[in-house]
Amino acid sequence: IHPNIDTPIADGIANTLDYLAHHWQDQPSLEHLAARAGWSLSHFQRAFTEHVGVSPKRVLQFLTIAHARDRLQDGASLLDTALDSGLSGPGRLHNLFVAIEAMTPGEYKTHGAALTITYGCAQSLFGPVLLGVTPRGICWLAFAKPDVSEAAEAEFHIEWALSQRIRDDRAVQPILDHALDHWRGHGTTSGLG
């Protein structure tokens, strides 16, 4: 949360984040979250997004997918993972994985077997990053400072050990640039996971 915001707004956002951390499996609606904060829907969405940096829906998606990834890594079925993650079924789980991870839950569960991931180093505002990209968008992003770049790349290869990995630094830079433009509000969402 931005350090220079009014206390009532900061308190409302902090309370919402705490609520989401404890009730994400209920998949609360934006309307429910705004009502809990005592704000109008539009004010809540705008204030939350401005001060947190992402929308309440995106925070909920991140919390949900973190749990779903853990369940899949533990060997749970797609149906059990979806239901245990507060989703209505495997279709919602599929959509969430494609939107956030740029791959299906099945591809994630198998560490990318039958998946081609193009990866490489690209330059960002925060320094070099190691970027992994599937045909659906970005699936991996790790800061790759000189002292940790080998470790970041080793972790990438372990995570996606069963995928076909193709190193192409020149191919990933425009994808990162496009993503950064989108995140700054200057681009479209095509090609982004």
List each model region and its residues.
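Basic nucleic-acid-binding alpha-helical/helix-turn surface characteristic of O6-alkylguanine DNA
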Residues: I1-S85, G91-G193
